[in-house]
Amino acid sequence: MLGCKEEDRIQFRIIKYSLTTLIRKWCDKMPIVFVSENAKKEADKIKVNLFQMQWKDQNKFDSGRKVFHLEHKYTVNDMINDMQKDPQSIGTIFKNYQIGWILKCEDSKLQKTNRINHDATYLEADINLIFRQ
């Protein structure tokens, strides 16, 4: 993929777009790993267990997707960048992948890409996470 980036930017963009789509579709089947404390408080008010909800379920409890955001803690863009840097680490990259629910207002505080330390990003944004037991 690195060679492709250097040789043909258009081809690289097509590959990156395809990988992004594949990873996001894969995520649709993955269990929710974390929920922010604030998202849990909001979900408790409407009697929803966010650990049981996937992106496809969101409109059932959040009409218009206005309150909650399904967050990729290890962003898809960062995953692809890491795959590009070290193609041998793809297995490790997928093992480190985490998704969870936060509030839209919390999402606005997060750096969208190039998160060097994903845990530190949440601490800096003052977003406390509850992990699946």
Tell where the protein language model's regions lie, with residue ranges.
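Amphipathic alpha-helical interaction segments
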Residues: 34, 80-82, 130
